[in-house]
Amino acid sequence: MDVGAKEEEMGQVWWGHRAWSLLSAVRARAPLVQCITNLVSMDIAANVLLAAGASPAMVHSLREVPDFTPRCDAVYVNVGTLSEDWLPSMRAAASAGRPWVLDPVAAAASGFRMKACLELLSLCPAVVRGNASEILALASRSTAASSNFKGVDSSHCSVDAIEAAKALALSSSAVVAVSGAVDFVTDGKQVISVSNGVPMMQKITATGCAVTALIAAFVAMEPSDAIVAAACALAIFGLVGEIGMESAKGPASLRMHLIDALYCLNEETVTSRVRISLRP
């Protein structure tokens, strides 16, 4: 979708109503999201999906994929705790014909991980979401892409990865989202910026994994417009972080309050506080 014309006409008003419309659709339809995700993130990803109104399913057995995955509305694949046992399930689920989202956690950590990410990327995800270092490494097709690699945390700012994200989007035909202080979402041509969120969210493990799961739920509602779905999911998640921070004393209480905030979000808050714009 060319969001430029819509934004020029209505700006933040359009984005606010679009974000609310997608969240409302998730609440009304309760999309079933299969999550083949890392062990660290299962709890927060499931709770974020539930708070948004989706139905999470942490189903990763290869023997279940043929029966279960076709019933799902979307699939979320995360390589954070990648193992040879899980990779066939990831391949099978990604090939099942459902819209799916890839989180290439720590893509540059090992040759095995990079090879797996590139193989999954070839299976046509609707969205790829990672931090700047992950997107830079994936775009370069090299484990040596970042000499300052810092595990699952990014050693680059999100703006550093915009051009890499655009190139990756064009080569893979996926929407690519780069998380950071400002999030960027691109289809290779348009770049959308999302400015919601608070720094302390980075102190909670697996928040990136959780927002990728939320993106999958939004993509399930709008599979033909993944760039808008991804941008709105990122904005909603950042917004509930802002709301949660108003009551939080630290990372643990922020985790609790942001999940509550997601469950309680109303139209007025969403339409007035999401900060999404088309990057010139």
Swiss-Prot record:
List cofactor names only: Mg(2+)
Q: Which Gene3D superfamilies match?
A: 3.40.1190.20
Annotated positions binding ATP = 129
**SUPFAM superfamilies to which the protein is assigned, alphabetical:** Ribokinase-like
Which EC class is this protein assigned?
Answer: transferase
Catalyzed chemical reaction(s): 5-(2-hydroxyethyl)-4-methylthiazole + ATP = 4-methyl-5-(2-phosphooxyethyl)-thiazole + ADP + H(+)
GO terms of molecular function: ATP binding; hydroxyethylthiazole kinase activity; magnesium ion binding
For the ligand (substrate), the binding residues are 58, 206
Name the EC number(s): 2.7.1.50
Which controlled-vocabulary keywords does the entry list?
ATP-binding, Kinase, Magnesium, Metal-binding, Nucleotide-binding, Plasmid, Thiamine biosynthesis, Transferase
Gene Ontology terms: biological process: thiamine biosynthetic process; thiamine diphosphate biosynthetic process; thiamine salvage
Q: Pathway of this protein?
A: Cofactor biosynthesis; thiamine diphosphate biosynthesis; 4-methyl-5-(2-phosphoethyl)-thiazole from 5-(2-hydroxyethyl)-4-methylthiazole: step 1/1
Q: Which HAMAP family match?
A: Thz_kinase (MF_00228)
Q: What does this protein do?
A: Thiazole kinase involved in thiamine salvage pathway.
Q: Which family does it belong to?
A: Belongs to the Thz kinase family.
Protein name per its UniProtKB record: Hydroxyethylthiazole kinase
Q: Which gene encodes it?
A: THIM
